[in-house]
Amino acid sequence: MTLLNVSDLSHHYAHGGFSGKHQHQAVLNNVSLTLKSGETVALLGRSGCGKSTLARLLIGLESPSQGNISWRGEPLAKLNRAQRKAFRRDIQMVFQDSISAVNPRKTVREILREPMRHLLSLKKSEQLARASEMLKAVDLDDSVLDKRPPQLSGGQLQRVCLARALAVEPKLLILDEAVSNLDLVLQAGVIRLLKKLQQQFGTACLFITHDLRLVERFCQRVMVMDNGQIVETQAVGDKLTFSSDAGRVLQNAVLPAFPVRRRTSEKV
């Protein structure tokens, strides 16, 4: 089942010039893509190529300058009030900057309950039980419930944001560099959790990342973005090889997992 369909999407930002006239800075250019239920797709690209802007458009935080975004066959621009509420529940995003994504005055308990209060019909006791369950799933315990964001480490706060997104059991989870910054042990645990959700609920995942190792471990498809365009789409197999210049640059930039000893025939 197709969850998200994007066709001929372009976007620009207007800013004033010295002459007083508005100038347009193109960020996305004729982007098209499809995401299906239960699949895991990576959007790979260097910083500043338009990945995060595309994500903001996909979840409805901004409207595109041109093109169409459809959710389950319905254009986002034409969703009625009830459909928009369901859309906000079904598609969740975890941002790279977790500090800006939460209210620093709220406790973790309040942060986790917020989407459940607005998007789900759960009693308070059920909300609290699910909050505790989601914390456990991201390797945190109830001791953080009464803490506020400034009292948490960056990794802890990132996991709180992930738990908040998972609490409403979304159909599509977009992670904007949200897993790449975790250590390898936590990253592996989060990936196991996401695989479980995919099996249980058919949750689709879109990883926005520059981490090629994450792509190879978890994703089924990868799209390479460069200068606001998707320049290549590849299935992820045993040996991932890119044909685009942008893809090859990213692949060549990956460091080996362990230091490689150079061979030499010279004797010291």
From Swiss-Prot:
Name of the protein in its database record: Nickel import ATP-binding protein NikE
NCBIfam families: nickel_nikE, PRK10419.1
EC number, as in UniProt: 7.2.2.11
Localization, UniProt: Cell inner membrane
Reaction catalysis annotation: Ni(2+)(out) + ATP + H2O = Ni(2+)(in) + ADP + phosphate + H(+)
Binding site for ATP: 45-52
Ranges where the ABC transporter domain occurs: 4-252
Lineage: Bacteria, Pseudomonadati, Pseudomonadota, Gammaproteobacteria, Enterobacterales
Described function: Part of the ABC transporter complex NikABCDE involved in nickel import. Responsible for energy coupling to the transport system.
Assembly and oligomerization: The complex is composed of two ATP-binding proteins (NikD and NikE), two transmembrane proteins (NikB and NikC) and a solute-binding protein (NikA).
